[in-house]
Amino acid sequence: MSETQNTQVTKRQRTLVGKVVSNKMDKTVVVLVERRVKHPIYGKIVMRSAKYKAHDESNQYNEGDTVEIAEGRPISRSKAWRVVRLVEAARII
């Protein structure tokens, strides 16, 4: 009982998948995340959306790309998410 156990508690990161709608800022992309929600009274399925600014260190993601973002520590006043990976590249027409 005199031994101390070294237990690590890992906090699970919150991740979302969305589409890049803007990459005009340096090292930042704006990601649109859409989700489906059932209306509490009428029961209809409605789309809710939110835009998140995410950190893109190498400026490699373009508009239309589908990316996965993860929440982290605040990088700036409005940016606390970072791009984890590219899910699907935008189709060039």
Swiss-Prot record:
Belongs to the universal ribosomal protein uS17 family. The keyword Transmembrane helix does not apply. SUPFAM superfamilies: Nucleic acid-binding proteins (SSF50249). Keywords: Ribonucleoprotein, Ribosomal protein, RNA-binding, rRNA-binding. InterPro entries: NA-bd_OB-fold, Ribosomal_uS17, Ribosomal_uS17_bact/chlr, Ribosomal_uS17_CS. This is Small ribosomal subunit protein uS17. It comes from the Bacteria. GO terms for molecular function: rRNA binding; structural constituent of ribosome. CDD domains: Ribosomal_uS17. GO terms for cellular component: cytosolic small ribosomal subunit. Part of the 30S ribosomal subunit. One of the primary rRNA binding proteins, it binds specifically to the 5'-end of 16S ribosomal RNA. GO terms for biological process: translation.
